Amino acid sequence: MKKIFLAIVILTISFTTFAGRTDSIPAKHSDVASVDAIINSLYNVISGPAGEKRNWDRMRTLFIAEAKMMATGKRQDGTIGKRVMTVEDYITVSGPFLEKEGFFEREIGRKAEQYGSVVHVFSTYDSKRKLEDEKPFMRGINSIQLWNDGKRWWIVSVLWQSETPDNPIPEKYLN
């Protein structure tokens, strides 16, 4: 009985691990060949007009399987909170909204630091519902951790915070 239980546990863990693997889908080389390429691909894949389905498989190819996506900001009660998601959580939670409402996010500033195969990017963004909108409805900073495995770049994590009146983006992150 113990052997059967152990076999079931091992199979369950194996299936759970491989079912959500983002690195099992081949990436388009031009999406992951450089830091610029992977950052541009990230913004591109979440952006599009209302009614347009996003290429979520393309998004999956940008991230390591264990990647985290986290939003942080001030709650209504004044405390600072966070929401931690997997790539699949992000697609499930944000995907329908982005596709229904329309969403275009673009990079308007970048600061990057590299040590070996690790890069940290502070990527300042603005967001619009339609490309032709005169003003963005939101701005903020994406803190993006990247890793190169010797063949390509991967996104390890994205932590973002939107700008607020009491927390404007410093000028040094806008150029």
Residue locations for each model-derived region?
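Short beta-strand edge/turn micro-motifs at domain boundaries
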Residues: 139-168
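Surface-exposed, charged secondary-structure patches
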Residues: 69, 73, 81-132
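Short, low-complexity N-terminal intrinsically disordered segments enriched in polar/charged residues
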Residues: 19-61, 175
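Hydrophobic pocket/interface hotspot
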Residues: 42, 59, 67, 121, ...
